[in-house]
Regions:
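Short, solvent-exposed loop/turn segments at the edges of secondary structure
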Residues: 2-7, 46, 96-98, 136-138
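Short, charged N-terminal helix-start/capping segments
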Residues: 11, 18-19, 27, 66-72
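Gly/Pro-rich active-site capping loops and adjacent beta-alpha segments
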Residues: 22-27, 32
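Non-catalytic terminal extensions of PLP-dependent enzymes
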Residues: 31-38, 55-249
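PLP-dependent aminotransferase class I/II
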Residues: 37-52
Length: 249
């Protein structure tokens, strides 16, 4: 059972069997189980033929090859990030990682006031999906390049992180404002960047096109910075005001 599609089984000890979730149409679960927590009692069955087809097409040699490539890609990124000052956690005895890596970003927060969230959001301005945030360690980012990424794409990702590292240094040296900078305000949507009013202390071009190749094939973020975890912990009513019902009458 991983973090992807919910297709893997979840096992419990015998004394918990009677509390397993039930289902309205399929006989499953225990006598004291709660109502269904998923509409599909057998998980995401559609994933099974996909996995089976993947195994058949690759075969034993192919599976070994893609596994090697996934690990090679991950270690290529990890070694490159370490040269940029990123600390990689959970390395093996030989200093290598598996198919993914976790960067510790806490030192950047202490030195520059730039958090792992700011880095993840800024990556979106380069056209990259934000990495997994603060899992399984707080203040970290997790990246898994997979076996299918070409070296050119990995190099672009490294160049993006190098630029972000330089942007953090600009904040530390006072060349960029501590709160009004490209990292704290990322990601930048096309709506914000094309608005008539621009009050930030940096150029639109720096926000939108931090590198030349970004301008050649820009993937625009559709949503800007939101309140993130604050919205999860603080309920806010988005209903129309009560006065609106009186106005209708």
């Amino acid at each position: 059972h991983g973090g992807g599609p919910g297709v893997g089984p979840i096992c419990v000890a015998s004394h918990l069997v009677e509390f397993l979730p039930t289902h309205t149409m399929v006989k499953t679960g225990g006598e004291h189980g709660i109502h269904a927590v998923a509409a599909a009692p057998y998980g995401s069955v559609g994933m099974l033929p996909v996995t089976y087809g993947y195994l058949l097409m690759l075969g034993a040699e192919g599976l070994e090859m893609v596994t090697k490539m996934a690990i090679l890609n991950a270690n290529y990124l990890a070694s490159s990030f370490e040269k940029l000052g990123f600390k990689i956690l959970f390395k093996g005895s030989k200093g290598r990682v598996g198919h993914e890596m976790i960067w510790d970003c806490n030192m950047f927060n202490k030195e520059y006031g730039i958090s792992e969230l700011d880095i993840a959001k800024r990556l979106m301005d380069f056209g990259f999906h934000a990495p997994t945030l603060s899992f399984p360690v707080h203040g970290t980012l997790m990246v898994e390049p997979t076996e299918s990424e070409p070296k050119e794409e990995l190099d672009r990702f490294i160049e993006a992180l190098k630029t972000i590292r330089e942007e953090m240094i600009e904040v530390g040296e006072g060349k960029a404002d501590k709160t009004d900078n490209v990292l704290k305000n990322a990601p930048h949507t096309h709506k914000v960047l094309t608005a008539d009013e621009w009050s930030h202390a940096y150029l639109r071009s720096k926000a939108a096109y931090p590198l030349a190749w970004v301008a050649e094939n820009k993937f625009w973020p559709q949503v800007g910075r939101v309140d993130d975890g604050y919205g999860d912990r603080n309920l806010m009513c988005t209903c129309d005001p009560l006065e609106s019902s009186n106005d209708e009458k």
